[in-house]
From Swiss-Prot:
<comment type="similarity">
    <text>Belongs to the bacterial ribosomal protein bS18 family.</text>
</comment>
<dbReference type="Pfam" id="PF01084">
    <property type="entry name" value="Ribosomal_S18"/>
</dbReference>
<comment type="subunit">
    <text>Part of the 30S ribosomal subunit. Forms a tight heterodimer with protein bS6.</text>
</comment>
<dbReference type="InterPro" id="IPR036870">
    <property type="entry name" value="Ribosomal_bS18_sf"/>
</dbReference>
<keyword id="KW-0687">Ribonucleoprotein</keyword>
<keyword id="KW-0699">rRNA-binding</keyword>
<protein>
    <recommendedName>
        <fullName>Small ribosomal subunit protein bS18</fullName>
    </recommendedName>
</protein>
<dbReference type="GO" id="GO:0003735">
    <property type="term" value="F:structural constituent of ribosome"/>
</dbReference>
<dbReference type="GO" id="GO:0070181">
    <property type="term" value="F:small ribosomal subunit rRNA binding"/>
</dbReference>
<dbReference type="InterPro" id="IPR018275">
    <property type="entry name" value="Ribosomal_bS18_CS"/>
</dbReference>
<dbReference type="GO" id="GO:0022627">
    <property type="term" value="C:cytosolic small ribosomal subunit"/>
</dbReference>
<keyword id="KW-0694">RNA-binding</keyword>
<dbReference type="GO" id="GO:0006412">
    <property type="term" value="P:translation"/>
</dbReference>
<comment type="function">
    <text>Binds as a heterodimer with protein bS6 to the central domain of the 16S rRNA, where it helps stabilize the platform of the 30S subunit.</text>
</comment>
<keyword id="KW-0689">Ribosomal protein</keyword>
<dbReference type="InterPro" id="IPR001648">
    <property type="entry name" value="Ribosomal_bS18"/>
</dbReference>
Length: 75
């Protein structure tokens, strides 16, 4: 029986030598929130703890400044 090997998760921010995650970079932040607007946990994305904290802070700042929605569109 063939075994399925899950792809190893890696931190994108470590690989790209990112110093600080910017709250104005909405395109990057959108990759780390769900369709309903929740922050995706690091066990799913593979982001290191240091960058996960920065990511959460940047997403919350972007939400406060209305760059990102708090929730999805209600109709």
């Amino acid at each position: 029986m063939a075994r399925y090997f899950r792809r190893r998760k890696f931190c994108r921010f470590t690989a790209e030598n990112v110093v600080e995650i910017d709250y104005k970079d909405v395109a990057t932040l959108k990759n780390y929130i769900t369709e309903s607007g929740k922050i995706v946990p690091s066990r799913i994305t593979g982001t290191r703890a240091k960058y996960q904290r920065q990511l959460a802070r940047a997403i919350k700042r972007a939400r406060y400044l209305a760059l990102l929605p708090y929730t999805d569109n209600h109709q």
